[in-house]
UniProtKB/Swiss-Prot annotation:
Species in which this protein is naturally found: Idiomarina loihiensis (strain ATCC BAA-735 / DSM 15497 / L2-TR)
Region (G3): 81-84
Region (G4) location: 136-139
Physiological role: GTP hydrolase that promotes the GTP-dependent binding of aminoacyl-tRNA to the A-site of ribosomes during protein biosynthesis.
Entry GO MF terms: GTP binding; GTPase activity; guanosine tetraphosphate binding; translation elongation factor activity
Subunit structure: Monomer.
Cysteine pairs bridged by disulfides in the record: none
Protein name from the UniProt record: Elongation factor Tu
Renumbered residue ranges of the record's region G1: 19-26
Keyword Ribosomal protein: no
UniProt-listed InterPro entries: EF-Tu_GTP-bd, EF-Tu_GTPase, EFTu-like_2, EFTU_2, G_TR_CS, P-loop_NTPase, Small_GTP-bd, T_Tr_GTP-bd_dom
Length: 394
């Protein structure tokens, strides 16, 4: 184990492999850890260890995912790889594995296939910001022109879904040959790592983003005023900051006159911390669970949006029967349920358990939201689906 591993001073970037079944995602994942461990230090993981992905639960949904990590001289990467197509769908929609960028694996022997397209579309819908392409199995294609043709096809497909197909990096390689230790093909893995370093920008840390805290509880403290508690989702709030209370009803302004944690007064509350914020001039009844406390002007309330959704299968504890247009479940955002009506897309009559689709939701009360916000779909407190806001409409 190299000492490098525990250096947390390097920026941390989350990536993952996506692409069609059997195009070599897991082999590539193994090759990256193996080659980079040799070149830069770190731990190699073999194919079997990655392929045997443990099951995890995210919002009540079982997802099989493998997590590996590796280092380049300038960064530390956390990388996810999923065994099955359904796991990718669930992973990307629940946000279980938030990706700062994805490695799209396309076999040069096949070119783009149906799941290639599906994963690119999903990436677009759930807000994966950057894609780097690894054309795999290039050792099996002798014809230079054929390789060029496949690369062109992949670039066109990415452009179709509003990724910069002409400009993004495409590396031609062979994961298996690199994994077997072939020197020339191993260089392609290092080239891929360089592409990740140079093409995927360093993600903005949660703490540097504008302040937002979902409100979980509201108390009234006599002589001091109203306190709201919750876990700071992003940013920093300081004593004296003006904030907005957004969602459920009209947005109101307030000032934070104190921040406390474990009954101690602090100057500030930061992303990831559970805090209580004392609000000046805000009455106990003006605030409720489900609203957010946020930096003014950074988030707005909405009722109508388009969502990319995964509906739980019966085996996952979901519905046993399909639902139809006019379906009105609860949508659980951050800390609360809001009823909403589902508008199915043209030509879709019913939705079966286990389906993945996009539809429009109209909520009965506004929720503070941005595109990319995750939610659960519930019926009487039981999770029956998961979704992500792909487009705000109203």
């Amino acid at each position: 184990m190299s000492k490098e591993k525990f250096e947390r001073s390097k920026p941390h970037v989350n990536v993952g492999t996506i692409g069609h079944v059997d195009h070599g995602k897991t082999t590539l994942t193994a090759a990256i850890t193996t080659v980079l461990a040799k070149v830069y230090g770190g731990a190699a993981k073999d194919f079997a260890a990655i392929d045997n992905a443990p099951e995890e639960k995210e919002r009540g949904i079982t997802i099989s995912t493998s997590h590996v990590e590796y280092d380049t001289p300038t960064r530390h990467y956390a990388h996810v790889d999923c065994p099955g197509h359904a796991d990718y769908v669930k992973n990307m929609i629940t946000g279980a594995a938030q990706m700062d960028g994805a490695i799209l694996v396309v076999a040069a022997t096949d070119g783009p296939m149906p799941q290639t397209r599906e994963h690119i579309l999903l990436s677009r819908q759930v807000g994966v910001p950057f894609i780097v392409v690894f054309m795999n199995k290039c050792d099996m294609v002798d014809d230079e022109e054929l390789l060029e043709l496949v690369e062109m096809e992949v670039r066109e497909l990415l452009s179709e879904y509003d990724f910069p197909g002409d400009d993004l990096p495409v590396i031609q390689g062979s994961a298996l040959k690199a994994l077997e230790g072939d020197e020339e093909w191993s260089k392609k893995i290092v080239e891929l790592a360089d592409a990740l370093d140079n093409y995927i920008p360093e993600p903005e840390r949660d703490i540097d983003k504008p302040f937002i805290m979902p409100i979980e509880d509201v108390f009234s403290i006599s002589g001091r005023g109203t306190v709201v508690t919750g876990r700071v989702e992003r940013g920093i709030v300081r004593t004296g900051d003006e904030c907005e209370i957004v969602g459920m009803k009209d947005t109101t302004k307030t000032t934070v006159t104190g921040v406390e944690m474990f009954r101690k007064l602090l100057d500030e509350g930061r992303a990831g911390e559970n805090i209580g914020a004392l609000l000046r001039g805000t009455k106990r009844d003006d605030v409720e669970r489900g609203q957010v406390l946020a930096k003014p002007g950074t988030i707005t309330p909405h009722t109508k949006f388009e969502a990319e959704v995964y509906v739980l299968s019966k085996d996952e504890g979901g519905r046993h029967t399909p639902f139809f247009k006019g379906y009105r479940p609860q949508f659980y955002f951050r800390t609360t349920d809001v009823t909403g009506a589902v508008e199915l897309p043209e030509g879709v009559e019913m939705v079966m358990p286990g389906d993945n689709l996009k539809f429009v939701v109209d909520l009965i009360a506004p929720i503070a939201m941005d595109e990319g916000l995750r939610f659960a779909i519930r019926e009487g407190g039981r999770t029956v689906g998961a979704g992500v806001v792909s487009k705000i409409m109203d």
